[in-house]
Amino acid sequence: MTNLRKTHPLMKIVNSSFIDLPAPSNISSWWNFGSLLGLCLIIQILTGLFLAMHYTSDTMTAFSSVTHICRDVNYGWLIRYLHANGASMFFICLFLHVGRGLYYGSYMYLETWNIGVLLLFAVMATAFMGYVLPWGQMSFWGATVITNLLSAIPYIGSDLVEWIWGGFSVDKATLTRFFAFHFILPFIIAALAGVHLLFLHETGSNNPSGLSSDADKIPFHPYYTIKDILGVLLLILTLTSLVLFSPDLLGDPDNYTPANPLNTPPHIKPEWYFLFAYAILRSIPNKLGGVLALVLSILILAVVPFLHTSKQRSMMFRPFSQCLFWILVADLLTLTWIGGQPVEHPFIIIGQLASILYFLLILVIMPITSLFENNLLKW
């Protein structure tokens, strides 16, 4: 009798995705982040579900309901901080996952890559709306500032902003709809992740060398299931350490003050994972220009496959491109630092230079360097 896992309509989907999947024999730990992102999504959906049981999306009671969760609900503090810091872990894994894709040329799988870019946008939108829900000072002013950016769109801008707000300012209607969207989006993300995997399994995984691994495949289970479990344990260790020892490390103290439309915080800034994009937004002294740069800073990822000029897929054997890749990483870290600083000298000029370098590296310097490397190898 044929094995049930290979014949049962549901089991064979799981089997062909996680058990008998032919995988390259040489993929490194940089390939662990897909499964870790799946785990992060599951953690966020579960903790979010339990938070939603006690949360009220009303301007009068939202802040109090979060306080109630932390003080009165059994292990409510744990659920709340797992959810808040789980978002940070989610973004760390996301950035490393995208970085891996850029380094090893995984973006050559166009459909997989573009759905990944779409997923990145969806996760960022979800995180932004989630940050508004506790209705603290930074929640309110963050929502006001970011939604206001849409008013830069010519002709329809101001109408669009009022339509999103559901009134003439960020208020009850805004909070209620943000809660609704924040609840539904993770399930859309889960569906998109399924499509992401579907397209990935059409081609099979890339590997560090960037060469075809068709001649040398190993089954996913037990080799990569065990390897993934190690990643999972490290992720859980990091997350629980963060939650139990310093849960507010990555948060903003301003968000422990209830939202007050009459009092603006001295420095409005988003969570750490948006700071690089926020720095790019602020570095352009024009509203529409800043908004365009903000969107393009992520959307530029969709253009990367078309800028691939090298004859090799991976950067593994391309030392000049490697140097530029790490300069790009350093540049993004610089932008993250600048995004959290006040708008004053010398931070303004550093932010502007880092923003210019970011776009120059991806659009101009890296493609030209790849051509130069081809030339060196007489290709």
Curated annotation (Swiss-Prot):
GO terms for biological process: mitochondrial electron transport, ubiquinol to cytochrome c. It holds the Pfam family Cytochrome_B. It is a multi-pass membrane protein. Keywords: Electron transport, Heme, Iron, Membrane, Metal-binding, Mitochondrion, Mitochondrion inner membrane, Respiratory chain, Transmembrane, Transmembrane helix, Transport, Ubiquinone. It comes from the Eukaryota. Its cofactor is heme b. A ubiquinone binds at residue 201. The chain crosses the membrane at residues 33-53, 77-98, 113-133, 178-198, 226-246, 288-308, 320-340, 347-367. Changing residue 98 to I: In strain: Isolate IZEA5429. The keyword Transport applies. It is found in: Mitochondrion inner membrane. One of its GO terms (cellular component) is mitochondrial inner membrane. InterPro entries: Cyt_b/b6_C, Cyt_b/b6_C_sf, Cyt_b/b6_N, Cytb/b6-like_sf, Cytochrome_b, Cytochrome_b_C_euk/bac, Cytochrome_b_N_euk/bac, Di-haem_cyt_TM. Heme b b562 binds at residues 83, 182. Heme 1 (or BL or b562) is low-potential and absorbs at about 562 nm, and heme 2 (or BH or b566) is high-potential and absorbs at about 566 nm. This is Cytochrome b. It comes from Sorex alpinus.
